[in-house]
C-alpha cells in the first residue's frame, strides 16, 4: 500500500512554490498549459527512482530546486522523502535523493506518449522478468507496453489448460478481455489467430487486429491493459493480486489523450471501477472529465499575475460540476480567458457598436455575419432578430 498525502515543490520547472494535498482515491489535476501539471507527476515519480538521472529541471530563476512528499504505507505511519536538484541539463543526476526507493514497485507511471504499432510475434516468450532496478527506472520513464501482446496471448492459451493459471490470473485475464468493450459495446475481444499469434477484435465494421484500433482506443488500452499486465508481473512472486485489489500509486499524464469527448467521462468511471483501492493522480485538459469527477477529486491550478502557480478555490457543492456547462468549466475551473472565437467577438462587438450608432447598414451587415456563425438553435438568434426589427426590417 502506498498513498501520497502531500507534495511540496520549490523551484522546479515553471513552479516557484507549490503545496498540494491528495486524497486516497482519484486526484484529477487540471489547468492551462504551462501551469506545471506534468512537472507535478514527474516530481512524484522521481521520488521513487534511484536519482542517478533526472528528467525534471530546476527553475531557471532558482539556484536549486527541491521536492518533498509525505506518504503512508501499510503501517499507516507518515513518512517523508525529498530530493534536491541543482543541475539544469538533460539527464543530470539529482544532487541529493533521500528516502525509501524500494517503494517503486508500488508506483506505476504512464507518460503522455501512449501509442503502439503492430507487433509480429514469431513465438511466445516467458513472462517479462521484473527487478528492483526496473521498478526504479519505470518510476521515472513510465511503463512499457511492448510485452502486452505476449502476456495476453500467453494467458489466453493457458486459460484453456487445467491448473496452469491461478484463480487471480484467470480473473485478471477475464478483466482484460472484458475491457476491450467497456468504452464501446460494439467492440469486443474475438479470438487469437493460432498461426500468427495475433489478437483479433470484433468491431461494427468487421474483425481487425487490435493494433488497428483508433488512436483514442489504443491510448485507453495502453492504460487499462498495461495496468493489468504490469500488476500481474510485479506481484507474481508474491502470490499475485487481482487488479481491483491493487493499493499502490498510479500516475497518468493527460488521461484524456486522443479520446473523443464521449469517451472522456467514461474513462473516469472506468478507471475508478477497475482500481477502487488505488490512489490515482492524473492530469487532464478535458472539461468532460472535470464534469465526471467528484469535487474532492479535483485539483484546479492557475497562474497569477506574478507567474506563481496556485490552487484554485472550488465551490464545495454536492454534485460537483455535473450541472455546469463545458464553457463554465473551461472559464471558472480551468482558467480559460475566453471560450468564444476572436472572429465571433469581433462580429458581436461590431453589431453592438452599430446599434449604439444606429448605423442601419452596418447593423444588417454585422447581423448577417453573425447569422452565418451561430448554431441554428442558439437562443441569441431570437434576440438579434428583435434588435434588428427595431429598425423596420423583419428577418424570417
Swiss-Prot record:
<dbReference type="GO" id="GO:0005524">
    <property type="term" value="F:ATP binding"/>
</dbReference>
<keyword id="KW-0378">Hydrolase</keyword>
<comment type="function">
    <text>Component of antiviral defense system Septu type I, composed of PtuA and PtuB. Expression of Septu type I in B.subtilis (strain BEST7003) confers resistance to phages SBSphiC and SBSphiJ. May be an ATPase.</text>
</comment>
<dbReference type="InterPro" id="IPR003959">
    <property type="entry name" value="ATPase_AAA_core"/>
</dbReference>
<dbReference type="InterPro" id="IPR003593">
    <property type="entry name" value="AAA+_ATPase"/>
</dbReference>
<dbReference type="GO" id="GO:0016887">
    <property type="term" value="F:ATP hydrolysis activity"/>
</dbReference>
<dbReference type="InterPro" id="IPR027417">
    <property type="entry name" value="P-loop_NTPase"/>
</dbReference>
<keyword id="KW-0051">Antiviral defense</keyword>
<protein>
    <recommendedName>
        <fullName>Septu protein PtuA</fullName>
    </recommendedName>
</protein>
<dbReference type="InterPro" id="IPR051396">
    <property type="entry name" value="Bact_Antivir_Def_Nuclease"/>
</dbReference>
<dbReference type="GO" id="GO:0051607">
    <property type="term" value="P:defense response to virus"/>
</dbReference>
<dbReference type="Pfam" id="PF13304">
    <property type="entry name" value="AAA_21"/>
</dbReference>
Amino acid at each position: 500500500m502506498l498513498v501520497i498525502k502531500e507534495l511540496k515543490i520549490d523551484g522546479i520547472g515553471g513552479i516557484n512554490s507549490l503545496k498540494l494535498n491528495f486524497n486516497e482515491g482519484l486526484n484529477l489535476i487540471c489547468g492551462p498549459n504551462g501551469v506545471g501539471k506534468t512537472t507535478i507527476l514527474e516530481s512524484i515519480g522521481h521520488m521513487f527512482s534511484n536519482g542517478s538521472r533526472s528528467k525534471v529541471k530546476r527553475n531557471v530563476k532558482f539556484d536549486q530546486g527541491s521536492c518533498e512528499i509525505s506518504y503512508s504505507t501499510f503501517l499507516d505511519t507518515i513518512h517523508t522523502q525529498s530530493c534536491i536538484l541543482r543541475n539544469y541539463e538533460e539527464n543530470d543526476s539529482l544532487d541529493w535523493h533521500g528516502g525509501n526507493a524500494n517503494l517503486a514497485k508500488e508506483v506505476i507511471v504512464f507518460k503522455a506518449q501512449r501509442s503502439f504499432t503492430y507487433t509480429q510475434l514469431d513465438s511466445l516468450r516467458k513472462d517479462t522478468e521484473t527487478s528492483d532496478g526496473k521498478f526504479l527506472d519505470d518510476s521515472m520513464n513510465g511503463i512499457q507496453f511492448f510485452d502486452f501482446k505476449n502476456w495476453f496471448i500467453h494467458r489466453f492459451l493457458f486459460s484453456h489448460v487445467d491448473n496452469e493459471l491461478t484463480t487471480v490470473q484467470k480473473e485478471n485475464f477475464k478483466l482484460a478481455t472484458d475491457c476491450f468493450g467497456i468504452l464501446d459495446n460494439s467492440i469486443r475481444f474475438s479470438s487469437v489467430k493460432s498461426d500468427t499469434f495475433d489478437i483479433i477484435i470484433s468491431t461494427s465494421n468487421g474483425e481487425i487486429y487490435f493494433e488497428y484500433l483508433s488512436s483514442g482506443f489504443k491510448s485507453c488500452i495502453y492504460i487499462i491493459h498495461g495496468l493489468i499486465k504490469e500488476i500481474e508481473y510485479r506481484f507474481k512472486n508474491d502470490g499475485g493480486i487481482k487488479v481491483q485489489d491493487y493499493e499502490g500509486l498510479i500516475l497518468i499524464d493527460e488521461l484524456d489523450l486522443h479520446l473523443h469527448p464521449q469517451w472522456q467521462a467514461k474513462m473516469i468511471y472506468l478507471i475508478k471501477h477497475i482500481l477502487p483501492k488505488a490512489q490515482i493522480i492524473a492530469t487532464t485538459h478535458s472539461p468532460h472529465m472535470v464534469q465526471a469527477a467528484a469535487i474532492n477529486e479535483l485539483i484546479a491550478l492557475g497562474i497569477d499575475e506574478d507567474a506563481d502557480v496556485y490552487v484554485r478555490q472550488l465551490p464545495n457543492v454536492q454534485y460537483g460540476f455535473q450541472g455546469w456547462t463545458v464553457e463554465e468549466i473551461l472559464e471558472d475551473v480551468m482558467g480559460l480567458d475566453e471560450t468564444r472565437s476572436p472572429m465571433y467577438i469581433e462580429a458581436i462587438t461590431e453589431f453592438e457598436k452599430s446599434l449604439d450608432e444606429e448605423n442601419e447598414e452596418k447593423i444588417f451587415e454585422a447581423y448577417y455575419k453573425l447569422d452565418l456563425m451561430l448554431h441554428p438553435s442558439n437562443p441569441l438568434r431570437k434576440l438579434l432578430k428583435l434588435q434588428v426589427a427595431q429598425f423596420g426590417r423583419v428577418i424570417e
